[in-house]
A protein has these predicted regions:
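Secreted/periplasmic proteins that engage bacterial cell-wall peptidoglycan
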Residues: 12-54
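Aromatic- and glycine-rich peptidoglycan recognition patches
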Residues: 3, 8-10, 15, 50-69, ...
């Protein structure tokens, strides 16, 4: 029996997320060519062997560690009520913002409440 050990890599998470910039936001969509915010974070993590729940509230509940914004590490999920994104460093994050927009990089993590960690 083949066993594969998955090692968390924030850099791999970020690169997977950045590979989807420009994909349209579609409410309820989970990829691979369109996303809503939590569908995006779920898809990115799944591509890296980490299975997290579908909605932003479930993603927060499933986190192994909830961290303050001052403790963020590259690859953490940024969380606020109703929205999630992936921290890419230097105060920036990649996310699927809202209807009419596309997956993109934005600045200003202070809009979020906390970071979520799954390892």
């Amino acid at each position: 029996q083949l066993q594969v050990e998955v090692t968390f890599s924030g850099e791999r998470i970020v690169n997977t997320g950045l590979s989807k910039t420009g994909c349209p936001y579609v409410w309820g969509s989970t990829g691979p060519n369109s996303f809503d915010c939590s569908g995006f974070t779920q898809w990115v993590y799944r591509q890296n062997g980490i299975y997290i729940p579908r909605t932003s509230s479930e993603q927060k509940a499933a986190a192994k560690k909830v961290v303050s914004l001052s403790e963020l590490e590259v690859g953490d999920i940024l969380w606020r009520s109703g929205h999630v994104g992936i921290y890419i460093g230097n105060g920036q994050y990649v996310h699927a913002p809202h209807t009419g927009d596309v997956v993109k990089v934005s600045s200003g993590v202070g809009k979020f409440t906390c970071g979520l960690r799954y390892q």
